[in-house]
Amino acid sequence: MSVVKSIRAQIPPIHREGYPFIGAFALATLVLFLIWAPLGWIGTVLTIWCALFFRDPVRVTPVREGLVVAPADGRVSMVVQMIPPPALGLGDKPLPRVSIFMSVFNCHVNRSPVAGRVERIIYSPGKFINAELDKASEDNERNSMVISTPAGQIGVVQIAGLVARRIVSFVREGQTLAPGERFGLIRFGSRLDVYLPEGAKPLVSEGQTAIAGETVLADFNLGDGGRTYRAD
């Protein structure tokens, strides 16, 4: 393998949603260079950051039935029992909820935590308070999705944050998702909540780093065989 190919192999692809933003940053950088070179270099750093924000690296997802993987890169901010939002239609009993906070430095492409059918997608307008606060799950702009699996229904909620102002969904109701398949993106910092079926036991802890499509959040078949993987 040549040096150029080796370098290219280490650079993750950029998601198409980022092209307009990267282009705008690059154009602004050119203007800044014309005004004053030091400003141009600051613009260059910001353009590189923007490109990294929209990176979309390949992930190797465990695909054995019963596994729930992280839908987002970031830090596990909460592992709690919580009544799901009424919009999800998952009942009024507390369910295990895993929350993952994404900083502006994380990859923001979101991936399906399970294999299943998208039953409902509900968009809710709202505020843009700090996504790390628990009340953000009720007050902030969010996009909720319910996925049906053999083990029960999984609720996935994309929550906009203090900086994030745009939730993007790539899927539609009735669509079948593979585990780790891309389903959306949130621009510039946010949170993902995953509501597990009653009785499920989360396998992650608060403060743990999660990798979208790879980190296992729960396993409905603990002790049953090994895991197989898919790369995408």
Curated annotation (Swiss-Prot):
Its EC number is 4.1.1.65. Keywords: Cell membrane, Decarboxylase, Lipid biosynthesis, Lipid metabolism, Lyase, Membrane, Phospholipid biosynthesis, Phospholipid metabolism, Pyruvate, Zymogen. It is found in: Cell membrane. Its main location: membrane. GO terms for cellular component: plasma membrane. Pathway: Phospholipid metabolism; phosphatidylethanolamine biosynthesis; phosphatidylethanolamine from CDP-diacylglycerol: step 2/2. It catalyses: a 1,2-diacyl-sn-glycero-3-phospho-L-serine + H(+) = a 1,2-diacyl-sn-glycero-3-phosphoethanolamine + CO2. Pfam families: PS_Dcarbxylase. The record marks G189, S190 as: Cleavage (non-hydrolytic). Is synthesized initially as an inactive proenzyme. Formation of the active enzyme involves a self-maturation process in which the active site pyruvoyl group is generated from an internal serine residue via an autocatalytic post-translational modification. Two non-identical subunits are generated from the proenzyme in this reaction, and the pyruvate is formed at the N-terminus of the alpha chain, which is derived from the carboxyl end of the proenzyme. It comes from the Bacteria. Signal peptide: none annotated. InterPro entries: PS_Dcarbxylase, PSD-A. The keyword Lipid biosynthesis applies. The active site is at S190. Binds 1 pyruvoyl group covalently per subunit. One of its GO terms (molecular function) is phosphatidylserine decarboxylase activity. Its cofactor is pyruvate. It is a peripheral membrane protein. Catalyzes the formation of phosphatidylethanolamine (PtdEtn) from phosphatidylserine (PtdSer). Heterodimer of a large membrane-associated beta subunit and a small pyruvoyl-containing alpha subunit. NCBIfam families: PRK05305.1-1, PRK05305.1-2, PRK05305.1-3, PRK05305.2-5. This is Phosphatidylserine decarboxylase proenzyme. It comes from Rhodopseudomonas palustris (strain BisB5). The gene is psd.
